[in-house]
Amino acid sequence: MIIHYLCTTLFFVFINMQRIVLFDIVKALCIVLVVVGHYIPENSPVWYECLNKLIYSFHMPLFMFASGFIYMATKKEGESYSKFLVKKLKRLMLPYVVVSVIVISIKMLTEKHAFVENPVTAYAYIKMLYFPEAGYFLWFIWALWWMFVIAPLFATKQKRLLLLGAALLLYCIPPFLPEVFCLKQFQSMLVFFILGAVCCDWSEIATSVKIPFWAVCLSFAALEYFYIRFDACHSVIPFVGIATIIYLSDIISRGAKKINGLLTISATSYIIYLFHTTFEGAAKAALQKFAPILLDDPFFAVGAVLVISAGVAGPMVLYRYILAKYKLTQFIFGIKRQQAASDRLPAA
């Protein structure tokens, strides 16, 4: 019942749907949370472990929600199903294959000379075709692909409401789909993607009711306390976390005079997702060699900021000066020419 209540509340309340810039900000905040969440060294202090647990409680559902909303907001009427899937293959799966080959090759070339987390064998080049072998975080791309396979089959608002009900049921029952092709993650994330699509469908209703921001934040803080302290409220937190970040993004979009930095991060969010662990790993290796004191208390926070900054800024520089510059890299990383010219990267 409480999950149903939170879904309904989110459905009717939390989004200023008329302003796509809101979801640019959501994407920017979300990708930063992803980069922070994926830096968790073994010697992390307790406060950082708690922060990491908090981020993991909702950040990927938030990403799925934003993807579902943007899918509906940018959906082309009359586009054939086959053409849509081919487009998503180019935008999602081709970059996934290319990045997987690059990361696996780097691991195989360096693991004999330096420490490599999650070392691989030559079989990884085959396994990556059905499992995110290059890096487990790449499961998101597989799961998002399945969202795009399923969602267009439910072509009306009413059908998407039925799909939302089915997705909520899949979310509530224990996972039963296999991990191959990341179907297990697809099962748990479908509800958030479809919820985003449904909220876009009914945007005129969603803006008619208001809940105070303080009430949303208080609910989120209380649930996170019980989650971190007692390992409870797993199923509920993602919905409240989504609402909190969307509310925060709406405040930023209306109140900030300059949000170009966030919009730039949002524009390169997919490239950041693909490459952030590579740049974080390089930054961590550099600190281990030249400034190991920054990897432990009392300077852990300084080192963490440097590594996380590399995870965000590195892919942005790569995108601007290499990937968006050449036709070949534009093709293999799913970057449209007009998009490269404007330095904007739409949601996958």
Positions of predicted regions on the chain:
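Alpha-helical transmembrane segments and their immediate juxtamembrane cytosolic regions
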Residues: 4-348
